[in-house]
């Protein structure tokens, strides 16, 4: 067994970062600690964002140039030399006042799309207004404007065609100043969705609002159509302004576990054949026969070339998926998807992929592709597939080991770039690697040794052909953004080092972060602790478990954060710990699939066991142990408190699930199967919070929910409240009027964290 790594964030400054091997953390003696007159990180600091972490959000526009917004000017940078020029003046944005929310440059750099009047809908979806700016004429285009309340808009990958969705129908502009061509006419609110996702596809499958995909040179536009006829509606009141005499009612087609699901169709239209005099009929591509035997999902779309596309389909029981590779026949003008180009992915122990099957990355000639799948030991690794599937053909794994590839970032003719957690055998780390395609033993970590104390958790943004890349070091030290050249990995320049924040934090007593593991049943389970300043292992501290614990989640990592836990540790001297038990991700399917078909069991037990293990470390006050979580974390919090373990004094559940039959079909059935007697109904019924109501008499409980939560409906907390009242349990509750799942409006955000802080102060007798 190798020595565990324990990561500390001293004062959070670059020079103060320390990586150690043994507990305790670096300590000051009692006199030095008492003499530390610096202020702490307060609740007001968190709520007002007093200390701002800077990032560097660039947008690549070629293999050697990127755009960056600075002082409201859009600057064009040369990656190699760092020189810049003004691409778009701030005066252009000033025309719209403060209403500009985003911009998008056409691939040929002739036009800029300006977004304003942004109105949020669900997690990813929104409506907005758009104007097109002509860069050659340096003026806005006033002809044939895009309608207000557009739901989605996107440039083609070459040139400057535009596709957009308005009132659930798709339109295409061949030229920005010319009239739009209407592609569909079947769109209907809450019923037929063309080119955009319905609620459940947006939230659980694509993680986006768009269901449009341009081909590489912009000839073809692919799109999905979702039909929610028959999908039951969730409805809730929206109270709005107090002058509204009757509340509004919001309706959303929302399939719950076992309910009628949306159906999906897939089409491709040739935009080069669009004209004002003839009608172009989109061509439909049907799902493979092996998934159309029952309910199924479209779960991935990827263009391979101008006349080849790959589609991934998934059965409703999400342990079987098929990738179909389809080719365009220029003679018959149809799309063919031969069974010899179908690739099947299955899971015998759980579900396909982490949340869905991973996307493929095709070689430039389209003859093969690389994809992250589980190897024979259950670890997610990169495998190479040939386009044409032969009987009994097995893909070739190019990575292997008891660690996981997180994502494929780029594929060139010579190398594949990916992020993994291999380094130091630390699941909560992230580093960038490249591997040679012709020699898989030629693998190199591009980030591991750059700044190993400050940087153990990286993200990357590569240029169009991966000639340059931006590394984003996100922890454990202050975030650092640098630009590199791929040929020799040379660092060309520092883009942002957060030195100003580093200087400010030198005057604040900041907590430290410890990342370590415990061994249970011969398996490593990782945890993190946010420890108070001047932590003294001979003292007893209150402990708050910060839990999520959903399938494929990870809370123990090497990332840097300034959040509520920073305040609790710095000012209130509370240890805030998170533990990744069974069901968590990035450590192999054995751990992740352990909770398959039994949510609310092992992941709940593991949080209780983690608290017991922390108590054994000697510095936790056994009479002051609490737990809190949001969403799935709220469910686990409630199940833990309702277990009657005697370990926890109090807890906070925000927007919790309470019964899995109340949650959406795609997420719930992925892990639980169907709520039918033939499948898994018994466990659906045995995993409710309400069934544990009697045990809440032993704990202090704060239940919180937003009344306009479109995701985890207020119904979930309402049923917990009803069960607790029926059981005669005294508890606290807080609702937030018209707030959704994030409870993120300015006033509600401040109120909820103030309220939760007061609850913990009372529970831990801190005031």
From Swiss-Prot:
Name by which UniProt lists this protein: Dipeptidyl peptidase 4
Effect in UniProt of substituting residue 632 to G: Reduced activity
Subunit structure: Monomer. Homodimer. Heterodimer with Seprase (FAP). Requires homodimerization for optimal dipeptidyl peptidase activity and T-cell costimulation. Found in a membrane raft complex, at least composed of BCL10, CARD11, DPP4 and IKBKB. Associates with collagen. Interacts with PTPRC; the interaction is enhanced in an interleukin-12-dependent manner in activated lymphocytes. Interacts (via extracellular domain) with ADA; does not inhibit its dipeptidyl peptidase activity. Interacts with CAV1 (via the N-terminus); the interaction is direct.
Superkingdom assignment: Eukaryota
Glycosylation sites: 83, 90, 148, 217, 227, 319, 521, 686
Keyword vocabulary terms for this entry: Aminopeptidase, Cell adhesion, Cell junction, Cell membrane, Cell projection, Disulfide bond, Glycoprotein, Hydrolase, Membrane, Protease, Secreted, Serine protease, Signal-anchor, Transmembrane, Transmembrane helix
PTM section of the record: The soluble form (Dipeptidyl peptidase 4 soluble form also named SDPP) derives from the membrane form (Dipeptidyl peptidase 4 membrane form also named MDPP) by proteolytic processing.
Annotated catalysed reactions: Release of an N-terminal dipeptide, Xaa-Yaa-|-Zaa-, from a polypeptide, preferentially when Yaa is Pro, provided Zaa is neither Pro nor hydroxyproline
Ranges per topology, Cytoplasmic: 1-6
GO process annotations (BP): B-1a B cell differentiation; behavioral fear response; cell adhesion; endothelial cell migration; locomotory exploration behavior; negative regulation of extracellular matrix disassembly; negative regulation of neutrophil chemotaxis; positive regulation of cell population proliferation
Extracellular topological segments: 29-767
Membrane-spanning intervals of the chain: 7-28
């Amino acid at each position: 067994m190798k020595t565990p790594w324990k990561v500390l964030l001293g004062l959070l400054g670059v020079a103060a970062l320390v990586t150690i091997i043994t507990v305790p953390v670096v300590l000051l003696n009692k006199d030095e600690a008492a003499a530390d007159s610096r202020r702490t990180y307060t609740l007001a600091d968190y709520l007002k964002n007093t200390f701002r972490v800077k990032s560097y959000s660039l947008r690549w526009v070629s293999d050697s140039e990127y755009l960056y917004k600075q002082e409201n000017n859009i600057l064009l940078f040369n990656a190699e030399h760092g020189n810049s020029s003004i691409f778009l003046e701030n005066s252009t944005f000033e025309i719209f006042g403060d209403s500009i929310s985003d911009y998008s440059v056409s691939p040929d750099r002739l036009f800029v799309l300006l977004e304003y009047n942004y109105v949020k809908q669900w997690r990813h979806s929104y409506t907005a207004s758009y104007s097109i700016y002509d860069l050659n004429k340096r003026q806005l285009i006033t002809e044939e404007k895009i309608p207000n309340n557009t739901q989605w808009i996107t440039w083609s990958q070459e040139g400057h065609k535009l596709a957009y969705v308005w009132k659930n129908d798709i339109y295409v502009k061949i030229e920005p100043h010319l009239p739009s061509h209407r592609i569909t006419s079947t769109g209907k609110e809450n019923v037929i969705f063309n080119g955009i996702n319905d609620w459940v596809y947006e939230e659980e499958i694509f993680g986006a609002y768009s269901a449009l995909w341009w081909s590489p040179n912009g000839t073809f536009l692919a799109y999905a159509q979702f039909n929610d006829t028959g999908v039951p509606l969730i409805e809730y009141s929206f109270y709005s302004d107090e002058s509204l005499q009757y509340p509004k009612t919001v309706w959303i087609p929302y399939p719950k576990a076992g309910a009628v699901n949306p159906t999906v169709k897939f089409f491709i239209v040739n935009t080069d054949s669009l004209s004002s005099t003839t009608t172009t009929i989109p061509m439909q591509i049907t799902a493979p026969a092996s998934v159309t035997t029952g309910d199924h999902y479209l779960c991935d779309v990827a263009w391979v070339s101008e006349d080849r596309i790959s589609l991934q389909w998934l059965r409703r029981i999400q342990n079987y998926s098929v990738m179909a590779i389809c080719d365009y026949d220029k003679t018959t003008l149809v799309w063919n998807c031969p069974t010899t180009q179908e690739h099947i992915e299955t899971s015998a122990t759980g579900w396909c992929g982490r949340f869905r099957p991973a996307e493929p990355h095709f070689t430039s000639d389209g003859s093969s592709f690389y994809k992250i799948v589980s190897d024979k030991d259950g670890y997610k690794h990169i495998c190479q597939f040939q386009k044409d599937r032969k009987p009994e053909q097995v893909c070739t794994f190019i990575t292997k080991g008891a660690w996981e590839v997180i994502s494929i970032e780029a594929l060139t003719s010579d190398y594949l770039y990916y992020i993994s957690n291999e380094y130091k055998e630390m699941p909560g780390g992230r580093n960038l690697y490249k591997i040679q395609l012709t020699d898989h033993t030629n693998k190199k970590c591009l980030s591991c040794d750059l700044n190993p104390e400050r940087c153990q958790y990286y993200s990357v943004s590569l240029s169009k052909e991966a000639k340059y890349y931006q590394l984003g070091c996100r922890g454990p030290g202050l975030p650092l953004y640098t630009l590199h050249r791929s040929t020799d990995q040379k660092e060309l320049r520092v883009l942002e080092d957060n030195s100003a924040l580093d200087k400010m934090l030198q005057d604040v007593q900041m907590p430290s972060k410890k990342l370590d593991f415990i061994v249970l049943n011969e398996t490593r389970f990782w945890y993190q602790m946010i420890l108070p300043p001047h932590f003294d292992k001979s003292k007893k501290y209150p402990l708050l478990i910060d839990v999520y614990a959903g399938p494929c989640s990870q809370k123990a990592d090497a990332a840097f954060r300034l959040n509520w836990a920073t305040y609790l540790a710095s000012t209130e001297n509370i240890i805030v710990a998170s533990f990744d038990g069974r069901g968590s991700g990035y450590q192999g399917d054995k751990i992740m699939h352990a909770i398959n078909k039994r949510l609310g069991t092992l992941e709940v037990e593991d949080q209780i066991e983690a608290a017991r293990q922390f108590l054994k470390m000697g510095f936790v006050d056994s009479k002051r142990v609490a737990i809190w979580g949001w969403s799935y974390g709220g469910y686990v919090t409630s199940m833990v408190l309702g277990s009657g373990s005697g370990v926890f004094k109090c807890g906070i559940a925000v927007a919790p699930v309470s019964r899995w039959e109340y949650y959406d079909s795609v997420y719930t059935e992925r892990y639980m199967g169907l709520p039918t007697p033939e499948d898994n109904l018994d466990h659906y019924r045995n995993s409710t919070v309400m069934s544990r109501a009697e045990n809440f008499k032993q704990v202090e409980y704060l239940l919180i929910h937003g009344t306009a939560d479109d995701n985890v409906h207020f119904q979930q907390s309402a049923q917990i409240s009803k069960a607790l009242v029926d059981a005669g349990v005294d508890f606290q509750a807080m609702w937030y009027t018209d707030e959704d799942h994030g409870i993120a409006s300015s006033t509600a955000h401040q109120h909820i964290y103030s309220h939760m802080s007061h609850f913990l102060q009372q529970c831990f007798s801190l005031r």
